[in-house]
Amino acid sequence: MKIILASKSGVRKKILDKYKIDNEVIISNVDEDEIKESLLAEGANPFLISKNLAEIKSNKVSSKNPDRLVLGADSVISLNEELISKPKSREEAFKILKKLNNSKHYLISSVCISKNGSMIWNHTDSSELKMKNLTDKELSFYLDKIETNILLSYGVYQIE
């Protein structure tokens, strides 16, 4: 059975392909920033935000593809319960890295499987991360190295 991946993440697609899971990608096109703002206003913590985003994406695509299994996923970075968003510029990326530099933070990832527009399974887990202490020069070198991928990752760095 071919599952639907409700994600534009190339990494998630590669993982499914690596394990020979027959899949097709249908992007949910939900406004993640709007959803995050709403959840934060309601007092949601980063775990709940990650879970809800995965579920919303999965359910949206699932409702348009009845009787198909849809996999939605989301990951966020949390530093002292503060959600770290994707940067919009290199300057913002540098500021985020400075904030994470030499500090403990968490990668929170959620996965949701939906069918007929409703969640049938979900899981959320976290990994504790600590970036070693880097100089401004080392941070700039890193940003130069990852180039346009700067804007694709929460927390700016890529651990996949």
Question: How would you label these PLM feature ranges?
Answer:
Residues 75-77, 107-114, 157:
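Short beta-strand scaffold segments in enzyme catalytic cores
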Residues 72:
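Generic enzyme active-site microenvironment
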Residues 35-39, 78, 118-125:
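Acidic/polar active-site rim loop that often engages polyanionic ligands
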Residues 96-98, 110-127:
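Anionic-ligand binding region
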Residues 1-69, 82-83, 137, 141, ...:
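N-terminal polybasic phosphate/anion-binding patch
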Residues 124-160:
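Active-site oxyanion/phosphate-handling segment shared across diverse enzymes
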Residues 2-3, 68-69, 105-106, 110, ...:
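Structural motif
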Residues 75-105, 131-133:
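Active-site-adjacent loop/tail segments of enzyme domains
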